[in-house]
Amino acid sequence: MNKKIIFSILKIIIIVAILFLVFFIFSNKSKKYNTDIDKNFISTKIEETKHPMEIESLRNREYPGGDFIIEEKLSNGTNYEQYIVSYKSEGLKIYGLLTVPLAPKPEKGFPAIIFMHGYIPPQEYSTTGNYPTYQARLANSGYITFKPDLRGHGNSEGEAVESHFSEKYVVDTLYAISYLKNYIAVDQNRIGYWGHSQGGEIGLRVVTISQDIKAASLWAGVVGSYKDMFETYNDKIDFLENATSTSLVIENGLPNKNPNFWNKLDPYSYLNDIHASIQLHHGTKDDSVPIELSMHLKEELEKLNKSVEYYEYTEDDHNISNNVNLAFQRTIEFYDKNLSVYTAEKY
């Protein structure tokens, strides 16, 4: 074999080797690129599948307000006007009771209270039939008040839910806050919250999500952590007797089995983010919601140096029936202190 043939063969071998090397390099790059795409896709899917009850998920949403629709003008109270109004939450028409002081409007508007009812069987609830005297006490003290019915209650659209296992009532409340802030007579820098029982539970979530609430008074609230409710005081909470059969528990397990999931839903994981002043009231003979839940919240807030007042009422029940006048006196003093014009200017 002459040198020319040998040289030609070597040339072919070198060219083939170079081509193979180039193919190998680009093939690996392509695989890496595809892997990166896969990782990004997986990451995106994980983000998309965040549970809607997670506190962070609720913080990242928007709750645009608008103008209340006046559905009916009711007879005036002692020192206030009252209206049945409606607003929109996730496209649903939600009704509520709005009260407005008859006094001249302050330069920057009246302070206002989101007033949240406790659990009432939705089919028995009515806009004007529940908590009217409670709301009137605040209205007579110079506060605009708005009590949203919540979805599935009274004439409001949508389906009622279990507040411990759904974000829907919190969403209705956050929309209500936006509408209340937009109301012409309201000073949007002086908004408080009042909640009883289930309304206390909703309120605790709301103050970890929104900084619009400057002061929250929670009466006999379901304000425990998920650990409190499922483990520590489960035997004292009748409304959790069927909790293990809810889809949220079936799909994700109990808090002690899947703490990572439940911690993201639990307002106790976000107590340090609370900017509102908190006031807690509870009767020692409450047989619906154990007083230990309010005691635990008080202790945790104090550890974080948060502003918290705590009142317990000896031998009193879930509605603080024997001490309701004292409890309201303390509540109104609390709002007067934390929702004054001077206080609002600090925010």
Predicted region positions:
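N-terminal targeting or regulatory segments adjacent to alpha/beta-hydrolase or S9 domains
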Residues: 2-80
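N-terminal cap/lid segment of alpha/beta-hydrolase-fold proteins
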Residues: 61-107
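Short beta-strand element of the alpha/beta-hydrolase
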Residues: 108-118
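Short amphipathic alpha-helix adjacent to the substrate-entry channel of hydrolases
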Residues: 127-147
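Alpha/beta-hydrolase active-site loop
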Residues: 163-184
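Hydrolase active-site cap/lid region
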Residues: 204-255
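Short beta-strand/loop motif that positions the catalytic acidic residue
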Residues: 274, 280-282, 286
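C-terminal catalytic histidine-bearing segment of alpha/beta-hydrolase fold enzymes
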Residues: 295-298, 302-347
